[in-house]
């Protein structure tokens, strides 16, 4: 039997205006709809190649007990950087927010989806022009909002080699990674000119696979902008 669990759901509020003070409509469904942007966790979940243990789910109990009632219980374990997950800013910025310190206002709000899938190559870097072109059509990225980058890489999910760019594991895999990410210039522009609480991308990292300095991580997380990966 394949057991699956989803750990994260993101809410897209289709608007480019500041988030409402009252989120009641989001939760009762009157202000929009819930969209699950996560990949399920299972034995086939794709992890960062140096996280080699993968997802583990162990059955502790399943069946009738001596007391006469049915009882099911499981234990799970997982490295941090696999499947759809949140990078807290402290991941690349010492002294910045840890997961439990991120307020709810840093995890929800109006979302903008910038689609670069039509031009994204395995080493594509999202540019300032990608962002300003989107704004020219849709308006300014929302204050207190979440920027989601669609590269089309989510369609490769399930094929580890196609998704990561290599079938290698461990440290030797890292130089062989190929997937799109956010360019350093675009990250700089965002922290200088816009007021986001989070970014997200449908690849294994907000930096592109060939990055050796993880500048998008460093720049954004230093400003307490969290990152969703493998969306």
Describe the role of every protein-language-model region.
Residues 1-2, 148:
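Intrinsically disordered, low-complexity sequence elements enriched in Ser/Thr/Gly/Pro
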Residues 2-10:
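Sec-dependent signal peptide recognition
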Residues 10-11, 195:
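Generic alpha-helical structural signal
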Residues 17-231:
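Active-/binding-site microenvironments in catalytic and ligand-binding cores
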